[in-house]
């Protein structure tokens, strides 16, 4: 039987970029990685009402640059920038280096997989029927330009005795195509019956690099010439 690979990890270095971008030797790698995980968890908990999609961390020359992608930048910044200044200080204390925070606004939250998954999870926690929540999310994503979307929920749906998986798809979601821009997100709904997992795949089109088109073929030719 085939197993599904993570859509983002599958495309790293092709159409997706890493969430943490820094270099460290073997003695510091574990410490940096653990710090990144702690900072992400802290920011998500601190800004749980700000619709945060993803957090990118860079470490240039004894500094840190944290980029927060959010649909509600006003909540992150706060009145006269007070909240973001406080957040910067707290993150710097955890990372042990000066921190600069960038805020990137998400213009279309209906087409962001992480925010869509969290929205569905929130509706399930408020006892909305899962089929209604799924169809609403699919319709909203297509309305703002998504070429395809698949949503899946797993668990004790509507309080049933036996856990099951239900999914709904509209349009194309080509998971095997590396050049396909697939946005994948996951969230959990904590209901009185247990945890329900929510997965969302959104296809936004194909990324075609016209400048390097044919480059792999050229590399094969050069390698063959070198061997021959």
Swiss-Prot record:
A Gene Ontology molecular function term for this protein is: structural constituent of ribosome
* Family, per entry: Belongs to the universal ribosomal protein uS3 family.
Q: Summarize the subunit comment.
A: Part of the 30S ribosomal subunit. Forms a tight complex with proteins S10 and S14.
Q: Which UniProt keywords apply?
A: Ribonucleoprotein, Ribosomal protein, RNA-binding, rRNA-binding
Q: Which InterPro entries match?
A: KH_dom, KH_dom-like_a/b, KH_dom_type_2, KH_sf_prok-type, Ribosomal_S3_C_sf, Ribosomal_uS3_bac-typ, Ribosomal_uS3_C, Ribosomal_uS3_CS
Cellular-component GO terms for this entry = cytosolic small ribosomal subunit
> Encoded by which gene?
rpsC
Q: What does this protein do?
A: Binds the lower part of the 30S subunit head. Binds mRNA in the 70S ribosome, positioning it for translation.
Put simply, this protein is called: Small ribosomal subunit protein uS3
What PANTHER family does the annotation carry?
Answer: 30S/40S RIBOSOMAL PROTEIN S3 (PTHR11760), SMALL RIBOSOMAL SUBUNIT PROTEIN US3C (PTHR11760:SF19)
Q: Biological process (GO) annotations?
A: translation
* Residues annotated as domain KH type-2: 39-107
